[in-house]
A protein has these predicted regions:
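Amphipathic alpha-helical scaffolding segments comprising HEAT/armadillo-like alpha-solenoid repeats
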Residues: 2-6, 27-39, 58-69, 88-100, ...
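Membrane-proximal soluble helical/coiled-coil segments
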Residues: 4-61, 74
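Short inter-helical turns and helix N-cap capping residues of alpha-solenoid HEAT/ARM repeat scaffolds
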Residues: 10-11, 41-43, 71-73, 102-104, ...
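Residue-level signature of the C-terminal ends
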Residues: 22-25, 52-59, 83-86, 114-118, ...
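Solenoidal tandem-repeat scaffolds enriched in leucines and small polar residues
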Residues: 107, 112-156, 169
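Short, intrinsically disordered, charge-balanced linker/junction segments flanking boundaries
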Residues: 167, 174-183
Length: 183
């Protein structure tokens, strides 16, 4: 009860503290509150909850995920990464239109999502390859972050090159991706 009250507090610092407290606990008892908080207009809190739920995606309601994934910002991109394959198929047209978004997070997350259900999709592959071509360190690092759970979309050779890239930002992001691979 106390944690739930803290999560529902009007103080962002208390809410973030409560999110930190529950990170290693079973979260089902706070599911309703966490979903409600995801619909607030606080991107810091939304991001922390999404990162907390990354390996426990079942605590986030499908309707909330769809709503979040419609945002044109980093929160929307994180929401896209949570979508199950059947949701990606349902949202395919919108995600396909997002591939050329000016928001790097939305474009990268949408490209990866489309490639999860259509590995041969040329437009999504072209866009992802553009990100991985390291013309812009930030864009490449962002794209790598969205490949964490889809590392099969990245060849071993390219991952190895990115691990040894002179940019710390890129090599760190590549290391995060490689930690998810089994090959």
């Amino acid at each position: 009860k106390t944690i739930n009250e803290t999560l529902e507090s009007d103080d962002i610092n208390q809410q973030l503290f409560a999110v930190e407290l529950i990170k290693d606990l079973e979260m089902d008892q706070w599911r309703q509150t966490l979903n409600k908080l995801l619909l607030t207009d606080n991107p810091i809190l939304q991001k922390q909850i999404l990162l907390l739920a990354f390996n426990r995606k079942s605590i986030i309601d499908k309707k909330v995920l769809i709503q979040l994934s419609n945002q044109k910002n980093e929160i929307g991109a994180l929401g896209i990464t949570f979508l199950a394959d059947d949701n990606i198929r349902e949202e395919k047209k919108r995600l396909y239109n997002n591939i050329n978004s000016s928001d790097t997070h939305i474009s990268a997350a949408s490209s990866v999502a489309i490639l999860r259900i259509e590995p041969e999709n040329k437009l999504a592959r072209k866009r992802l390859d553009e990100f991985l071509d390291v013309k812009d360190e930030d864009s490449t690092a962002i794209a790598l972050d969205y490949l964490k759970n889809s590392s099969e979309l990245l060849t071993r050779d390219l991952l190895n090159n990115l691990l040894h890239h002179p940019s710390t930002k890129i090599s760190k992001s590549a290391l995060n991706v490689s930690g998810e691979r089994l090959d």
